[in-house]
Swiss-Prot record:
Claim: Lyase is one of the keywords in the record: yes
Protein name: Dihydroxy-acid dehydratase
Binding-site positions, Mg(2+): D82, D124, K125, E447
Self-association state and partner proteins as the record states: Homodimer.
Note on cofactor: Binds 1 [2Fe-2S] cluster per subunit. This cluster acts as a Lewis acid cofactor.
Enzyme Commission numbers on file: 4.2.1.9
PANTHER family: DIHYDROXY-ACID DEHYDRATASE DAD, DIHYDROXY-ACID DEHYDRATASE, MITOCHONDRIAL
PROSITE patterns the record matches: ILVD_EDD_2
NCBIfam families given in the database record: ilvD, PRK00911.1
Biological source species: Metallosphaera sedula (strain ATCC 51363 / DSM 5348 / JCM 9185 / NBRC 15509 / TH2)
Gene from which the chain derives: ilvD
Length: 557
């Protein structure tokens, strides 16, 4: 039996005849209204390719819902395309959109009394925003990813969008021609779907499987594949099954499920944004998760995946060898995954993986065995020290160097740093420090992809490091340390750094320090005054007042 108590409160009984009249105006019958009314939350717009196909997929999801006796109602959630906003003031709205998406789903689902919902996402912040709404509302719900784009092509080799960002730096350094840059621009994204490498979108899709919120194997199929369509229908059917047994997101999102997510994040070398978003989803689920949990698991889970930006392959390649379950099964077999966590199938993680058919051909060029990893520890490390007492995050899998000691070059905004990099005024050995770009200071904690890609494109990726209280795109590579907390806007040590101060990044020891005495830092702190808020009205001003530290997931309180 389905629980219709939520929709009955809005549409049931003679006194709700006016409410039902609105549904009948759209062609619904008494029989339709008597069934579970379920939402299909689609993060859709025409701003970019990541989500352009999701309305079509939502129709297939609705077919699956109808097959098992539900009445689906589609609604949209806002989308901000990070790749388009990147490197501009618009990027300040990116992380903000995560919270807006979660709020939008809550508003629509609770405002219309839906009995459950499917969440369908594509671009970077749509996915954590939707998963946060699932955890917050805690009614039967299932997540589905819209799929990745296929690899692009440049003179016969596969490329992804990260290659275009780096090409901007290469062009500014005279290493490629304007024609090369144009060809890459024209061919990097060949059609619908999210960015092809193991950037934030694909990272979050994989994590949805590890958490148990989406169907096994559903994260890897490209947007244009027939498997994507099959998963759409099965996702709709799965929602009705979940509703029948009364399974809710918080039954799935246990502490052990988040440990599974962290283990996959470390083994895959996924986006550092995965840290921020897992913390935020856990917050909504009422699960106590900290950076120490990431640090602990990172030390015992090797990185075994060879995907861009640190590696060679894209999500479509992982799909061909079996998808995310290939990685999860290796972790389970080694005892690095909790097999008893429940998932949206109603079965445990171990049961799902035992039933999933993995192609029987060689795949160690993309996914290695744990006995022969690409890195002996996780692809992401948590760094703490005098420059980041609460913590910071670095993606070691995307850097050939793990240690750097050098003089600080301090900038108070991304724009200042980017202009200096393009003018080739950054020297080998420098540590570029970009501050006042944190959750409160930006506000919005922008991703520094334009700057990091320009550094790499100029050939300085192994000779220069970067430290920021902002974030990084999943496409970032090089020794780039982000999420520095406390941030500059609240007087964190990063606010006290001056040009020429020596900064030490030690990825293997998990340290981020500035070579200054405690006495000197305290002296500088006395002279520091908080900057005026950059925004006095509007959404960004509201966000800056409510947002917490990146060490807590930059959630709102």
């Amino acid at each position: 039996m389905y629980d219709k108590s939520r929709s009955n409160k809005v549409y049931g009984g003679y006194e709700k005849a006016p409410n039902r009249a609105f549904l009948k105006a759209m062609g619904l019958t008494d029989d339709d209204i008597s069934k579970p009314l379920v939402g299909v939350a689609v993060a859709w717009n025409e701003a970019g390719p990541c989500n352009i196909h999701l309305l079509g997929l939502s129709q297939v999801v609705k077919e699956g819902i109808r097959e098992l006796g539900g009445t689906p109602r589609t609604f949209t959630a806002p989308v901000l395309i990070d790749g388009i906003a990147m490197g501009s003031e618009s990027m300040k709205y990116s992380l903000v959109s995560r919270e807006v998406i979660a709020n939008t789903v809550e508003l629509t689902v609770n405002g219309h009394g839906y009995d459950g919902f499917v969440a369908l996402g594509g671009c970077d912040k749509t996915q954590p925003g939707l998963m946060m709404s699932m955890a917050r509302l805690n009614i039967p719900s299932v997540y589905m990813y819209g799929g990745t784009t296929l690899p692009g092509n440049f003179r016969g080799r596969d490329i992804a969008i990260g290659d275009v960002y780096e090409a901007v730096g290469a062009f500014s350094a005279g290493k490629i021609t304007a024609e090369d840059l144009r060809i890459m621009e024209d061919n990097a994204i060949p059609g619908p779907g999210a960015c092809g490498g193991l950037y934030t979108a694909n990272t979050m899709a994989m994590l949805s499987e590890a958490l148990g919120l989406s169907l096994p194997g559903s994260s890897a199929p490209p947007a244009v594949s027939s498997d994507r369509t099959k998963f759409a229908k099965e996702t709709g059917r799965t929602l009705m099954k979940v509703m029948e047994i009364g399974l809710k997101p918080r039954d799935i999102l246990t502490f052990e499920a988040f440990e599974n997510g962290i283990a996959l994040l470390m083994a895959s070398g996924g986006s550092t944004n995965g840290v921020l978003h897992l913390l935020a989803i856990a917050h909504e689920a009422g699960v106590s998760l900290t950076l120490d949990d990431f640090d602990r698991i990172s030390k015992k889970v090797p990185e075994i995946v060879n995907m861009k930006p640190g590696g060679d392959y894209v999500m479509a390649d992982l799909y061909r060898v079996g998808g995310t379950p290939v990685i999860l099964k290796k972790l389970l077999d080694r005892g690095l995954l909790h097999g008893d966590t429940i998932t949206v199938t109603g079965k445990t993680m171990a049961q799902n993986l035992s039933e999933y058919k993995i192609p029987e051909f060689k795949h160690d060029h993309i996914v290695r065995d744990l006995s022969n990893p690409f890195l002996p520890s996780g692809g992401i490390r948590i760094l703490k020290g005098s420059l980041a007492p609460e913590g910071s995050v670095v993606k070691l899998s995307a850097s050939k160097i793990k240690y750097h000691r050098g003089p600080a070059r301090v900038f108070n905004s991304e724009e200042e740093a980017f202009e200096t990099v393009l003018k080739k005024k950054i020297n080998e050995g420098d540590v570029v420090v970009i501050r006042y770009e944190g959750p409160k200071g930006g506000p919005g904690m922008r991703e520094m992809l334009a700057v990091t890609s320009a550094i790499v494109g100029q050939g300085l990726g192994e000779k220069v490091a970067l430290v920021t209280d902002g974030r990084f795109s999943g496409a970032t590579r090089g020794l780039m340390v982000g999420h520095v907390a406390p941030e500059a806007a609240v007087g964190g040590p990063i606010a006290l750094i001056r040009d020429g101060d020596t900064i030490v990044i030690d990825g293997e020891k998990g340290r981020l320090d500035v070579e200054l005495s405690d006495q000197e830092l305290k002296s500088r702190a006395k002279d520091w005054t908080p900057p005026e808020p950059r925004y006095k009205t509007g959404l960004l001003a509201q966000y800056a007042k409510l947002v917490t530290s990146s060490a807590r997931g930059a959630v709102l309180v």
